[in-house]
Amino acid sequence: MGKEKTHINIVVIGHVDSGKSTTTGHLIYKCGGIDKRTIEKFEKEAAEMGKGSFKYAWVLDKLKAERERGITIDISLWKFETSKYYVTIIDAPGHRDFIKNMITGTSQADCAVLIVAAGVGEFEAGISKNGQTREHALLAYTLGVKQLIVGVNKMDSTEPPYSQKRYEEIVKEVSTYIKKIGYNPDTVAFVPISGWNGDNMLEPSSNMPWFKGWKVTRKDGNASGTTLLEALDCILPPTRPTDKPLRLPLQDVYKIGGIGTVPVGRVETGVLKPGMVVTFAPVNVTTEVKSVEMHHEALSEALPGDNVGFNVKNVSVKDVRRGNVAGDSKNDPPMEAAGFTAQVIILNHPGQISAGYAPVLDCHTAHIACKFAELKEKIDRRSGKKLEDGPKFLKSGDAAIVDMIPGKPMCVESFSDYPPLGRFAVRDMRQTVAVGVIKAVDKKAGGAGKVTKSAQKAQKAK
């Protein structure tokens, strides 16, 4: 078998009709985890519905529909392979909670693939003031997705088809605005593709002899190639934060007969091992970890990215819950946040937001109302420079530094210390009103809290 390939996560962004689904579907279909039988079944259904041309998007529509109906679909369907990586598509917009998911980061994307449509009028619509292209790219950058690939799609529908002039015009325009957001266009691969016909997806296209390939210049190594697949292969692999102290936000807590209390969640930073003494914040409960499991197999250690269940002694299901965070009691244990300072960007709010506004925040797995206690300064969202002190209110499009106070105990961290616990979505009126990153946290020193017998024993034994 040799060494397993590295896993990377990508998010596919772009305007609603840019062809994201077709492009993604094409990759999954050609290099991915969908088996022949499923594809044949889809093709048959597509033909019966008169979608006989079998758009690749159909694959994705089927998967999406299942995901939306809450059927947890086999996640391998959202995977494909390049020569170097196993790639998982964590989400593709168009999914209802896309923005929320992108922020609360069910998992953090290592790279964003921005799809723009080259068709007449289509590109302009996507990039216009209210097109989603800008918002998605800005979000990706704000949330720390620092690598970007741009697929200029639907090259088969330019005027004339496969027009070099049109491609160059789009590259120039996209470069200008991703630069404004904060990306350096020299580090971004631009690829002219047709997700539908397959041009430059996996093999170089004979329809665009003028395209001499893409090149990226970056301090971690330059790269070049022709196809979208090669561009994905040149993503810089992520460094997983094993050296940081443990942070594990709980997704659920189960009570399992004969075993006891089993919290479940994803290790975001650090390492979780049996025998460790962990503290749960904000509830301030400390106990010993008896065992750690993943996919029903016992682990000697769980690393960042692992979704695990772990058995804890002398803790009832009432003591800990979803949204709590587990950490090492001896190494920067997590604590309750009395308040925190954040940089927020208001995405869509019909009115004005002033001090006292108390929407729900989604941060890691926590879902808690927080009050905008003080609007400290309004800033330029591109440069971060201060525009005014103590603004009276904020409206859509504004960026600001604000002080926030949780309505109930919660545990968050600064983005610079623990990125997954330092970004949040602000939800109100059933939509994402704002996104933010936490700059600083005022931690509540809570004394010892509840320390279970097994924790005391384990601590003595050391």
UniProtKB/Swiss-Prot annotation:
Residues 194-196 are annotated as: G5. The modification 5-glutamyl glycerylphosphorylethanolamine is found at residues 301, 374. It holds the Pfam family GTP_EFTU. One of its GO terms (molecular function) is translation elongation factor activity. Residues 5-242 form the tr-type G domain. It comes from the Eukaryota. Residues 14-21 are annotated as: G1. It catalyses: GTP + H2O = GDP + phosphate + H(+). Gene3D superfamilies: P-loop containing nucleotide triphosphate hydrolases (3.40.50.300), Translation factors (2.40.30.10). Residues 91-94 are annotated as: G3. The keyword Hydrolase applies. Belongs to the TRAFAC class translation factor GTPase superfamily. Classic translation factor GTPase family. EF-Tu/EF-1A subfamily. This is Elongation factor 1-alpha 1.
